């Protein structure tokens, strides 16, 4: 009897969990589209146009930090890396630069000196003194004698 009650209890527990999950789904509130900030505006503190505190460590001109489009029309030349490198890239058209000019801008590559492995792997196995009486070693000794004769004949 206790087994039946345990089975019924587990059944009710599973069913109650299903309804509990359905109830939680109805309670989720989704905000309006105006509540979400655009990715470009994340980090700006209000409409003042000043950069957030965590960006104060970067030394970039103030005209680049301002989110207002009117500030770009009043931009003055800056000595920062971003404006100097981008202005040189856009001042010269890609059709005006030749391949040789592009290759001239690339620094030369120095080769890496790797240590050379002077040891060559031998395909022959070394003879052991204990296996000299076996038929295999006698065959290898015959082969080595023939190779010895051919080497000697080449030298003479």
UniProtKB/Swiss-Prot annotation:
Q: Which domain of life is it from?
A: Eukaryota
Q: Where is the CRIB domain?
A: 30-43
Q: What is its main location?
A: cytoplasm
Basic residues composition bias: residue spans:
117-128
Q: Does the keyword DNA-binding apply?
A: no
* Subcellular location per the Swiss-Prot or TrEMBL entry: Cytoplasm
Q: In which tissues has expression of this protein been reported?
A: Expressed in roots, leaves, flowers and pollen.
Q: What else is known?
A: Over-expression of RIC10 in tobacco germinating pollen increases pollen tube elongation.
Q: What is this protein called?
A: CRIB domain-containing protein RIC10
Gene assigned in the entry = RIC10
């Amino acid at each position: 009897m206790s087994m039946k009650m345990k089975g019924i209890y587990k059944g009710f527990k599973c069913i109650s969990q299903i309804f509990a999950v359905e109830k939680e789904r109805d309670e989720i509130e989704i905000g309006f589209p105006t509540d979400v900030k655009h990715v470009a505006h994340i980090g700006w503190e209000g409409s003042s146009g000043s950069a957030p505190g965590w960006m104060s460590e970067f030394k970039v001109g103030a005209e680049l930090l301002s989110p207002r489009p009117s500030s770009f029309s009043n931009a003055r030349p800056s000595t920062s890396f971003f404006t100097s490198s981008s202005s040189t890239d856009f001042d010269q058209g890609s059709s005006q630069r030749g391949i040789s000019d592009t290759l001239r801008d690339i620094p030369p590559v120095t080769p890496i000196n790797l240590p050379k492995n002077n040891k060559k792997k031998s395909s022959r196995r070394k003879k052991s003194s204990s296996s000299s009486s076996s038929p295999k070693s006698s065959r290898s000794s015959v082969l080595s004698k023939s190779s010895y004769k051919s080497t000697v004949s080449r030298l003479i």
